[in-house]
Amino acid sequence: MRIVVALGGNALLQRGMKGTFQDQQAACRLAMSQIVKIVKDGNELVMTHGNGPQCGAIFLQNVAGEQEKVPAMPLHVCGAETQGFLGELLQQELDGALRAEGIKKNVVSIVTQSFVDPKDPAFQNPTKPIGPFYSKEEAEFLRNERGYNMVEDAGRGYRMIVPSPVPQKFVEKEAIKTLVNSGFIVVCSGGGGIPVILDEQENRIEGVDAVIDKDLGASVLAAATNADAFMILTDVPEALLNYRKENETAIRQATVAEMEKYIEEGHFIKGSMLPKVQACLRFVKSTGKPALITALDCALQALKGERGTKIVPN
């Protein structure tokens, strides 16, 4: 079975970590010790990852570097840098996990660009949180002194927000499919892909300053690679109804129609669980195949139907 797995950027930079290379390497090693179980069980694996914390950190490093007369790079370049950095980590740590299990599989990462619509309303309405969490006082300083868009992120603190256009298709689609069909484990579409547009007048591709939601990007990837299932890994075993209320209930399986009803009822937090559910719905609707939401340490159990939220066609 071919599985596309979307790994959250926060899984590679956990809360409380300073964000050093060693921190992220340790988190990645822990994550790959779980991911390798999917391969060991006989499945084909395509993996994508978030990059919110990493992209935000690189962006802030660019801003700080300007004080030393080091030119800052555009946001889309920051995204490309995270694909290279996290691609290296994921390749090395998954390769190590495969070796430890005696599994002979090659892992390759691809810098991936995603076409977006230049008229996407997201460019006028930034919603995507990136970077570290700040206190209310720090957020007010960054908003007033630096002009950043800062919002509260699901009760966890304040973060910078940037445009998040809907991904259309990947520039490297055929290369990814060729590698997957040849038996490679492919790491691609990091952070949803580098957002690009086609300048029709110049007939060339250009990057744009935005961050694509990695889950929506992953759903496009899953459909493009003919995945048998699409899995989003987050920090909870199942999506929940009545989140943080006395009658909180885990969703074990639901149809597209049922999940759409839950969205209308406001059960999923914007910027947190909501985009994950929306990405799953997009995949299930376009392919007729199931999507899963679960925690990293429940991934294999979810594939076996023992844990997780499974979304199926009507």
From Swiss-Prot:
GO terms for cellular component: cytosol. It is an enzyme of class 2 (transferase). Its EC number is 2.7.2.2. It comes from the Eukaryota. Gene3D superfamilies: Acetylglutamate kinase-like. It catalyses: hydrogencarbonate + NH4(+) + ATP = carbamoyl phosphate + ADP + H2O + H(+). Pfam families: AA_kinase (PF00696). Transmembrane segments: none annotated. GO terms for biological process: arginine deiminase pathway. Keywords: Arginine metabolism, ATP-binding, Kinase, Nucleotide-binding, Transferase. Pathway: Metabolic intermediate metabolism; carbamoyl phosphate degradation; CO(2) and NH(3) from carbamoyl phosphate: step 1/1. GO terms for molecular function: ATP binding; carbamate kinase activity. Homodimer. Belongs to the carbamate kinase family. This is Carbamate kinase. It comes from Trichomonas vaginalis.
